[in-house]
Amino acid sequence: MAAAGAFKSAVARAQDVQSAPFKAGAGRAEVVFADDIFPIDGFVAEHDLLAVRVLLLDDGEHRTAIAVVDLTSITDGTIASFKSILTEIADVSAENALVCASHTFSAPHVFPPDQMPAGTDAARNDAKAKAFEVALRQAAQAAVTAMRPARLGFGEGVSRVSVNRDVETPFGWWLGADDAGFTDPALGIVRLEADDGTPLAIVMNFAVQSSVMDGSERASGGKLISADLAGRAARFVEDHYGADTVALFLVGAAGDQAPYLQAARHVVDANGNVGREDIHETGFTILDLLGERLGQDVVRTADAISMDSATTLQTHRATIEVPGQGSSPKNRPVGPVASFAYEPAGSVDMPVALMRLGDVAIVGVQPELSASIGVTIKRGSPFAHTMVVTMVDGGAKYMADALAYDRYTYEARNSPFAKGAAEMAAAKIIDLLNALKSDND
């Protein structure tokens, strides 16, 4: 009788989960720096405010979170700190939380106290860290407060705001803009809305770095902080739908993808010397135009999405092993080369996070993948819809495709992963997706 009672209790719990409404909530908070923090990391002021955005999802059995922070990258120690805040405020375990950098190139770096590079101003670093922590707390609390029954839908559009940044020069491959190079124009959108149709959150996934203002300074000197392309597009979407909507940008496989135009463009002179030509503050006009165009593409796609009220959540984590190579910030590429000797360095562990939202799969990895690798994963996925997201739960430099190694590109030479690692990782990730799909069908 006891066994029968336990079985009935299990059935009742399962029925409760099935009957529990799918809920979602999202929050946004601006990162506020004190005026006396400047100058910092070469930045002398702010052009636009950085932000933290949090999305919470709950199917009655699992609660998951996606946090997008306007930073270039996030260290392991800071990831752990951010996840503890999400656990404290939103009751989301570290396992079920994805902390993503928006990958804006126009933001100062934040380091945990035990990971600060030599020469770092500890007091200012602490002030930066606290500003982001306060914003995360505010965004997470806003997401908790906003939780309500919701529906989810996926759509895919197209945007043309990116370009392949690997260009061939007489001296070898270097950075720039190559219209003939491979790019992935697919724009993946997850729309979450309340029962009355009010958009709660728009999640956008696109393969482009937020680097319109990368390396650009004011005409009078000094850089300006900006959320760059991801932030401008997110603000456009939020302004379009209203104050109750939060737009989260998940950077795709953008290791070799740049905004179509940049304020400080790369040049190689007749002698093979590299440099940049900067149009200074005028670059923010480019940022506005590209951000608005991407935002318009997002809205156009989101408005055509059909919604589904039944959504099952699941998070799965794994570690895959791929071949590595010697890499150090001290020997980062400084220009094009005609040849290069890669140094094998054993194997490297690569964390992979999979998040299932009904028939949508989110693949999260740390390294910046080449766009072709992102497309390979999406095409091989058994799910109806797949998003490939980089800069998730930390960063690990570049994971370039095999062709990049043959060309000695910036990404291939600035990578801890050996030639073939990206293709191997893609195959293993597809295997993980197949296992996740079969376990739940």
What are these model-derived regions, one by one?
Residues M1-R13:
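N-terminal export signals
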Residues Q15-G295, T301-D441:
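Conserved beta-alpha junction segments in alpha/beta enzyme cores
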